[in-house]
Amino acid sequence: MAISVRDDGALHLQGDLHISDVEELRTVLIGRLETASELVLDLSGVDRCDTASLQLLCSVKKSAERDRKQLCISSLSPVVREVCTMTGLPL
């Protein structure tokens, strides 16, 4: 997994998202949401993902909403879209 910041401030995730990446990803997302009212994630570069990674995204999104902040997904790769559809996870 690689995380970069686009020119517009969105976080671009690239590569594979697996359970081994969950803690690092959680730290990055929570850290960004502590200093901003909105966080945009670009998942178009994600090649593979597991349900643990998607569950983390759903959890962070719910936490953000509870704190009256927004976690927005700007785009989903076909792989992420398929896993969301198969598991019923709403992103």
Segments (PLM) and residue ranges:
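STAS-like cytosolic regulatory interaction modules
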Residues: 1-49, 59-91
